[in-house]
Amino acid sequence: MKLNELRDCEGATKNRKRIGRGIGSGTGKTGGRGVKGQKSRSGVSLNGFEGGQMPIYRRLPKRGFKNFFSKIYNEVSLGRIQLAVDTGKLNIEKPVDMIALKEAGIIRREKDGVRLLSDGDLKAKITFHVSGASQAARVKVEKVGGQVISPEVVG
Protein backbone atom coordinates (compact mmCIF):
# COMPACT_ATOMS: atom_id res chain seq x y z
CA MET A 1 0.00 0.00 0.00
CA LYS A 2 1.23 3.47 -0.92
CA LEU A 3 0.21 6.96 0.26
CA ASN A 4 -1.63 7.67 -2.99
CA GLU A 5 -3.71 4.52 -2.48
CA LEU A 6 -5.16 5.56 0.90
CA ARG A 7 -8.96 5.87 0.89
CA ASP A 8 -11.68 6.36 3.48
CA CYS A 9 -13.58 3.22 4.47
CA GLU A 10 -16.85 2.52 2.70
CA GLY A 11 -19.62 4.64 4.28
CA ALA A 12 -17.21 6.77 6.33
CA THR A 13 -18.08 9.95 4.45
CA LYS A 14 -21.49 11.13 3.38
CA ASN A 15 -22.45 14.02 1.09
CA ARG A 16 -24.24 16.81 2.94
CA LYS A 17 -27.89 17.52 2.22
CA ARG A 18 -28.25 20.64 0.06
CA ILE A 19 -31.18 22.79 1.13
CA GLY A 20 -33.71 24.47 -1.14
CA ARG A 21 -32.99 22.46 -4.30
CA GLY A 22 -36.48 21.36 -5.30
CA ILE A 23 -39.24 19.23 -3.82
CA GLY A 24 -37.63 15.92 -4.80
CA SER A 25 -34.54 16.60 -2.68
CA GLY A 26 -36.46 16.27 0.58
CA THR A 27 -35.42 19.71 1.82
CA GLY A 28 -36.78 21.90 -0.97
CA LYS A 29 -39.36 24.69 -0.81
CA THR A 30 -39.21 25.80 2.85
CA GLY A 31 -35.75 24.30 3.45
CA GLY A 32 -36.40 22.88 6.91
CA ARG A 33 -37.65 26.19 8.31
CA GLY A 34 -41.33 25.30 8.65
CA VAL A 35 -44.03 27.58 7.29
CA LYS A 36 -44.21 31.39 7.48
CA GLY A 37 -43.49 33.44 10.59
CA GLN A 38 -40.48 35.42 11.75
CA LYS A 39 -38.17 32.41 12.06
CA SER A 40 -38.75 31.37 8.45
CA ARG A 41 -37.45 34.68 7.13
CA SER A 42 -33.81 35.36 6.36
CA GLY A 43 -31.53 37.28 8.71
CA VAL A 44 -33.63 36.79 11.84
CA SER A 45 -32.44 35.44 15.16
CA LEU A 46 -34.26 36.32 18.33
CA ASN A 47 -31.48 37.30 20.70
CA GLY A 48 -32.30 36.55 24.31
CA PHE A 49 -35.46 34.59 23.45
CA GLU A 50 -35.60 31.31 25.34
CA GLY A 51 -38.74 29.73 23.93
CA GLY A 52 -41.17 31.49 26.26
CA GLN A 53 -39.16 30.78 29.41
CA MET A 54 -38.33 33.97 31.33
CA PRO A 55 -35.02 35.06 29.76
CA ILE A 56 -31.87 35.32 31.87
CA TYR A 57 -31.63 39.09 31.43
CA ARG A 58 -35.06 39.45 33.06
CA ARG A 59 -34.51 36.82 35.75
CA LEU A 60 -31.44 38.57 37.14
CA PRO A 61 -31.81 41.88 39.00
CA LYS A 62 -30.58 45.19 37.63
CA ARG A 63 -27.21 46.06 39.06
CA GLY A 64 -24.82 49.02 39.01
CA PHE A 65 -24.22 51.69 36.41
CA LYS A 66 -21.49 52.88 34.04
CA ASN A 67 -19.67 55.97 35.27
CA PHE A 68 -18.96 57.99 32.13
CA PHE A 69 -16.49 60.21 33.96
CA SER A 70 -14.28 57.36 35.22
CA LYS A 71 -10.73 57.29 33.91
CA ILE A 72 -8.72 54.20 33.00
CA TYR A 73 -4.98 54.60 33.38
CA ASN A 74 -2.05 52.59 32.03
CA GLU A 75 -0.24 51.38 35.14
CA VAL A 76 3.52 51.21 34.66
CA SER A 77 6.01 49.94 37.23
CA LEU A 78 9.37 51.61 37.78
CA GLY A 79 11.06 48.23 37.24
CA ARG A 80 9.74 48.03 33.66
CA ILE A 81 10.89 51.58 32.97
CA GLN A 82 14.39 50.78 34.28
CA LEU A 83 14.48 47.67 32.06
CA ALA A 84 13.60 49.81 29.01
CA VAL A 85 16.37 52.28 29.95
CA ASP A 86 18.90 49.44 30.34
CA THR A 87 18.00 47.95 26.94
CA GLY A 88 18.17 51.37 25.26
CA LYS A 89 14.49 51.53 24.29
CA LEU A 90 13.71 54.60 26.40
CA ASN A 91 15.49 57.95 25.93
CA ILE A 92 15.88 59.65 29.33
CA GLU A 93 17.39 62.93 28.08
CA LYS A 94 13.86 64.19 27.35
CA PRO A 95 10.95 64.09 29.83
CA VAL A 96 9.17 60.73 29.74
CA ASP A 97 5.45 60.92 28.95
CA MET A 98 2.76 58.61 27.56
CA ILE A 99 3.95 58.98 23.94
CA ALA A 100 7.55 58.12 24.87
CA LEU A 101 6.37 55.06 26.83
CA LYS A 102 4.30 53.90 23.85
CA GLU A 103 7.21 54.31 21.42
CA ALA A 104 9.42 52.33 23.82
CA GLY A 105 6.84 49.51 23.84
CA ILE A 106 6.14 49.77 27.57
CA ILE A 107 2.44 50.49 27.04
CA ARG A 108 0.37 49.18 24.16
CA ARG A 109 -2.40 51.70 23.72
CA GLU A 110 -2.96 55.19 25.03
CA LYS A 111 -5.76 55.26 27.58
CA ASP A 112 -6.72 58.25 29.76
CA GLY A 113 -3.17 58.61 31.07
CA VAL A 114 -0.28 56.87 32.82
CA ARG A 115 0.09 56.04 36.50
CA LEU A 116 3.48 55.12 37.97
CA LEU A 117 3.70 52.24 40.45
CA SER A 118 6.66 51.59 42.74
CA ASP A 119 7.23 47.93 41.83
CA GLY A 120 10.93 47.35 41.05
CA ASP A 121 13.95 49.64 41.40
CA LEU A 122 14.81 52.79 39.49
CA LYS A 123 18.44 53.83 39.07
CA ALA A 124 18.17 56.43 36.28
CA LYS A 125 17.42 60.10 36.88
CA ILE A 126 14.22 60.69 34.88
CA THR A 127 11.64 63.48 34.65
CA PHE A 128 8.13 62.04 34.26
CA HIS A 129 5.10 63.86 32.84
CA VAL A 130 2.32 61.47 33.93
CA SER A 131 -1.28 61.59 35.11
CA GLY A 132 -0.45 60.21 38.53
CA ALA A 133 1.91 58.17 40.65
CA SER A 134 1.69 56.21 43.87
CA GLN A 135 3.26 57.80 46.93
CA ALA A 136 5.99 55.14 47.06
CA ALA A 137 6.79 55.65 43.35
CA ARG A 138 7.20 59.41 43.86
CA VAL A 139 9.60 58.78 46.74
CA LYS A 140 11.70 56.34 44.66
CA VAL A 141 11.90 58.72 41.67
CA GLU A 142 12.87 61.73 43.81
CA LYS A 143 15.41 59.63 45.73
CA VAL A 144 17.51 59.12 42.55
CA GLY A 145 17.17 62.80 41.58
CA GLY A 146 14.21 62.48 39.22
CA GLN A 147 10.95 64.38 39.13
CA VAL A 148 7.27 63.47 38.79
CA ILE A 149 5.15 66.19 37.20
CA SER A 150 1.42 65.52 37.18
CA PRO A 151 -1.53 67.87 36.58
CA GLU A 152 -3.22 69.49 39.56
CA VAL A 153 -6.50 67.81 40.50
CA VAL A 154 -9.26 70.41 40.93
CA GLY A 155 -12.32 69.81 43.12
Swiss-Prot record:
Family matches, as PROSITE patterns: RIBOSOMAL_L15
Region (Disordered): 1-47
GO biological process: translation
Gly residues: compositionally biased ranges: 21-35
GO cellular component, one term: cytosolic large ribosomal subunit
Basic and acidic residues bias locations: 1-13
Family: Belongs to the universal ribosomal protein uL15 family.
Subunit structure: Part of the 50S ribosomal subunit.
PANTHER family, sorted: 50S RIBOSOMAL PROTEIN L15, LARGE RIBOSOMAL SUBUNIT PROTEIN UL15M
Protein name: Large ribosomal subunit protein uL15
Originating species: Bartonella tribocorum (strain CIP 105476 / IBS 506)
Lineage: Bacteria, Pseudomonadati, Pseudomonadota, Alphaproteobacteria, Hyphomicrobiales
Name of the gene this protein is made from: rplO
